[in-house]
């Protein structure tokens, strides 16, 4: 597409609007100042004689103004929904992070408790082994003492473990 392809558009613009009184020209900011209204919509102010001269143009202007107002309202509503969604997502992420931190803290406590229990288990096992070894040593010493002493009949009656009964 070259620049010459748009010549039919320029011809249509130069012909003007048929059936509408007044002159059809390109919009110029000098003739149509644009003001920003407090509600966030755009409003084009045209000279009073142009407004009164054509009810069709006035109707189109009102329709465009309403369309811009609706579009601006929809844009504000969309931005508000997006802001609410962003806040909700941030809150959900913060809740998730707090939950994750609580879980990690609970896991760390459980690991520490498990380590303490393993240590206590090891100590108990070591104590049981030591006691068992001492019991075996005492039993051997007792057996050696019994074997080295001659048994009298009175000792046999007092000691039921010998098995002569």
UniProtKB/Swiss-Prot annotation:
<dbReference type="GO" id="GO:0033574">
    <property type="term" value="P:response to testosterone"/>
</dbReference>
<feature type="region of interest" description="Disordered">
    <location>
        <begin position="136"/>
        <end position="165"/>
    </location>
</feature>
<dbReference type="InterPro" id="IPR051771">
    <property type="entry name" value="FAM167_domain"/>
</dbReference>
<protein>
    <recommendedName>
        <fullName>Alanine- and arginine-rich domain-containing protein</fullName>
    </recommendedName>
</protein>
<dbReference type="GO" id="GO:0030324">
    <property type="term" value="P:lung development"/>
</dbReference>
């Amino acid at each position: 597409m070259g620049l010459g392809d748009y010549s039919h558009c320029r011809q249509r613009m130069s012909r003007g609007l048929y059936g509408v009184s007044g002159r059809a020209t390109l919009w110029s900011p000098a003739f149509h100042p644009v003001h920003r209204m407090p509600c966030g919509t755009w409003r084009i102010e045209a000279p009073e004689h142009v407004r009164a001269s054509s009810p069709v143009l006035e109707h189109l202007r009102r329709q465009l103004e309403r369309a811009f107002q609706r579009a601006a309202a929809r844009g504000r509503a969309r931005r508000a929904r997006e802001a609410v969604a962003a806040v909700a997502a941030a809150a959900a992420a913060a809740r998730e992070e707090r939950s994750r931190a609580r879980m990690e803290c609970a896991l760390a406590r459980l690991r520490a408790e498990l380590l303490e229990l393993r240590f206590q288990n090891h100590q108990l096992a070591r104590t049981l082994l030591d006691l068992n070894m001492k019991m075996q040593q005492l039993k051997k010493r007792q057996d050696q003492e019994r074997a080295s002493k001659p048994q009298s009949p009175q000792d046999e009656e007092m000691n039921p473990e010998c098995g002569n009964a």
